[in-house]
Amino acid sequence: MDKLPCNELNQVRKAPHAAIGPVLIEALPYIRKFEGKTFVIKYGGAAMKDACLKNSFAQNVTLLRKVGIRIVLVHGGGDAITKTAEKLGITSRFLHGRRVTDKEMISVIQMTLAGKVNQDIVQLISEHGGKAVGVTGLDADTIKALPHPNAETLGLVGEVEQINTAYIDLLCRAGLIPVIAPIGFDDKGNVYNINADDAASSIAIALKAEKLIYVSDVEGIHVGERILKTICKTEAADFIEQGIISGGMIPKVLSAFKTLDSGVGKIHLIDGKATHSLLLEIFTHEGVGTQFIAEQDSDQSQNR
């Protein structure tokens, strides 16, 4: 057996066989339940930077596809864009959390996301036995975009107008994992920088996905020291009113429920800094993050 590339990944080998077996068996009903379903995964944050976490994520995605789950991966890459711009002597500017994007910057974004970040992800998945294909929003009209309402100040920042679901579905039916860089275009040929969270949400809605999973740098929704396993719309409204959910988490929560209202089955927020968090969230009863559900009932709250 080849040595695993990370000490963290080797810890599982130290556990008694009797402890590992039940964890594997616990996954069985979820594998049956989700076979043939579509999961859209937004990949970003620390999980894209650390070599061990990148390996873990690629393994997780490959395993999900191998057990029959259709995976559509949408990635970010903000730090990589900033570093590339710096090397080229271009200063990055941000307004309300959005990257100000002129023609020079959109070229950097295309070069970095499509030419480097996207292909690195595809290669890593392939190394673990998966079949991934790199896609940008420009390919086969995958993402048609409109200018952002604040285009006068943000420049070539866009919002999703339309998703080519037929093309994505074609790739999934061929057994491939589409790895999508969030770049879009309009009828005039303008290319737009699109927020990866927004792109993932739009793709999940268009595909009527079973799940939209955000792999991020937060463990989930915190209430005090506790991470909520499940949250419904009513609870979220109460927590926002009480100030328990505040700051930058408010738009994320509201966006999650808007996506749910548009037909996506469940939304999950998980910590990409935790090894194998994706598998643990999907294939165990407890999960490791927070799942957003449309209605609170015993069946939904106890199942991933």
Swiss-Prot record:
Tell me the route in metabolism or biology where this protein functions. Amino-acid biosynthesis; L-arginine biosynthesis; N(2)-acetyl-L-ornithine from L-glutamate: step 2/4
Its EC number(s): 2.7.2.8
Write out the GO biological process terms.
Answer: arginine biosynthetic process via ornithine; L-arginine biosynthetic process
Top-level EC class, please? transferase
Cited CDD domains: AAK_NAGK-C
Give the function comment from the record: Catalyzes the ATP-dependent phosphorylation of N-acetyl-L-glutamate.
**Entry protein name:** Acetylglutamate kinase
